[in-house]
Amino acid sequence: LDSANIEYIKWDMNRQLTEVGSATLPAERQRELWHRYVLGVYDLMDRLTTDYPHILLENCSGGGARFDPGMLYYSPQIWCSDDTDAIERLKIQHGTSMCYPCSAMGAHVSDCPNHTVGRNTPFKTRGHVAMVGTFGYELDVTRIPQEDRDAIPAQIEEFNKFNKLVRTGDHYRIGNMFEDNTWDAWEFVAKDKSEALFEFVQVLGRPNERSRRIKLKGLEADAYYYEENEPDKKISGAALMNAGINIAKIWNGDGLYGDFCSKILHFIKV
């Protein structure tokens, strides 16, 4: 680590601990080894962060499921899973966010076809899903389609625009892929309720499907909000939370049609 100006470390261990035993412990204490191993990892992390406090350390869920509160003491972010498919990540990130802040969830835009499931998903959808976590890119930018490469600057700009809201806002799970695997949605609301970010993913398109009406959460009921792209259309927080918004297949001229498509809406208080 002293050999160069290293600012970031990904600590990974993609292997299994099998037939674990210790020649220094008696038979009745062999099961201590797992606990002792974790204490040893904590000691290593402590020495690493003490000697190199400027380094951003990212831990990994692999190699013993080290996505735990103890690891967050040493590293502010942890890689959720090597399964980076955007649709698979909906369940992974939904469950992880039940216990851990979104700022801790390692999430990247990865290549397609996805290396885990072989699925192709739109570049935009991959970006919207990764925005829930730390956001980054897990691909070779020189080998992706030119259209996707051209979209990267705007995607990064969009992430930076909403980064603070996602990190510090209240997180609401609007959809639930565990109950209905055809769609998912979530929302981030500023602590002062001045703005809200709503994200929607249509997982599977279905024939003759009616538009969905989705109710937002956490807004100020007596205040009025407008969607960033429609500043002249004012809607009360009460209406957005009780009547909801209409999710149609064709949304404001922008096609929300087919599998794996996504949309974000940014509501701002008047």
Question: Where are the language model's segments positioned?
Answer:
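Glycan-recognition surfaces
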Residues: 2, 35-142
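Conserved, mostly hydrophobic/aromatic
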Residues: 12, 57, 130, 198, ...
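Active-site beta-loop-alpha junctions enriched in small/polar residues
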Residues: 13-16, 60-64, 203
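Aromatic- and acidic-residue-enriched carbohydrate-binding clefts of CAZyme catalytic domains
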Residues: 15-42, 87
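Catalytic cores of secreted or luminal carbohydrate-active enzymes
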Residues: 124-175
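Carbohydrate-binding surface patches
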Residues: 178-220
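C-terminal beta-sandwich/jelly-roll accessory domains of carbohydrate-active enzymes
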Residues: 204-270
